[in-house]
Amino acid sequence: CLLSRGLEMCIRDRIRDIPHGTLTHEFYKSEISNNWERFIVYLPPCVPSAGLPVLYLQHGFGESEISWTTTGKANIILDNLIEMGKIKPFALVMSDGMVQEKVGSEERLNHVLLERMLVEEIIPMAEKKYQFGGCKEKRGMAGLSMGSVQTTRTICDHPDLFSEVGIFSGFIRENIEGNPDRDAVGRKPYEQIHLKAMDDPDFNNYFHTFFRCIGDNDCFLSRFLEEDAIIQEKGVHEIRKIYPGGHDWNVWRPCFADFAQMIFR
């Protein structure tokens, strides 16, 4: 029988007596950040990892690679959606977007480095070991807040690598680089160069899903609405949704659950 919306949402992020996937912590020395780094791999239950699609999933400012599987319950949501027959199994890779770049004896936050780390280190390493992904059609990227900025920049610079895109409570414009209060590197204001990729007539053909969402009481809602105009001006085909709630996990959990049901079809 069909579940009511409220009951279904309750079940999606509750631990139940069903098969559960695994979480593995992978450590490596990054040549880009000059630091030891970690990413977390979720593998769904009862299926081999080889050949699975994979979603690279990023957290927000001030959080870490564990956030999506602790507060976010992303692994539990996927376990439940798989058991309910709502999605086909796919893997997750969650990396630390608060990249601490080691410069001499000091460390400083440089979130921009994540793009290179993903493309040059994390994706090759994870996909070689677990044999998932391996091609654009089996690879997606999504992120919330700061992670949405990292997602947009990465998919715009590398549309050949990803077929599914999720921008949660999200921004298509960079809002950290060049910000005097948040950019520890002290760069000049960023000129949104990555958005030029959206002027490509083939931009919409690169992605199966381009999902953008936010809460109706989010402190960044006005910025999101401003970016509606950019999306429309550039003719980007998107799925857009506004949820009840603020800039918090009460929005991001159902947002992730909905996005999971759109991708890798």
Regions flagged by a language model, labelled:
Residues 61-131:
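Cap/lid segment of the alpha/beta-hydrolase catalytic domain
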Residues 243-249:
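Histidine-bearing beta->alpha loop at or near hydrolase active sites
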